[in-house]
Amino acid sequence: MREPETGPFLRRMKTSDLRAVMDIDARSLPKPWSEGIWRSELESPFALYLVLEEGDEIVGQIGVRNVLDELHVTNVAVHPEHRRRGHARVLIQAALSAYPDAGLVHLEVRPTNTAAVTLYRSLGFRETGRRPRYYGDEDALLMTLDLLAGRP
């Protein structure tokens, strides 16, 4: 008898997840974070890191830092074999919903990462500036989402 399939499952990231998370990071980013950076972020009281699991596999992650009433998305990555399934959208929406009183959400993205830029725009993020040579070889596109827009 086959076990019933379960959909994606979101949970807080643990240090025991770092091997899988760092693998996804390495497959997704030209300059992935070191284990030391990951451990430091997981220990921060101002950060929330979530993973998305399918079955027993971590397929994506997101990190958000909370500064007063603003959020900064520090990391979003989905395993290449699991992209284009809405996982990044689920991760972003889950992380933002953890902060119902947040006003603004900021992030940086490579302008050449057109899939991510398109996703962020579809979620309501707007371009607010650029950081020259932020990635060394490329500028960063600064994007902001106003969560207060439309609230009474």
Where are these regions (language model features)?
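Conserved acetyl-CoA-binding loop-helix of GNAT-fold acetyltransferases
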Residues: 78, 84-97, 117-122
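Conserved beta-strand-loop-alpha-helix junction that forms the acyl-donor binding cleft
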Residues: 80, 107-117, 133-137
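Conserved GNAT acetyl-CoA-binding A-motif
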Residues: 98-109, 131
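Terminal substrate-recognition subdomain of acyl/acetyltransferases
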Residues: 1-3, 140-152
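A short helix-loop-beta-strand connector motif used in the catalytic cores of GNAT acetyltransferases and
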Residues: 41-51, 70-72
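A short beta-loop-alpha structural element at the N-terminal edge
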Residues: 7-21, 146
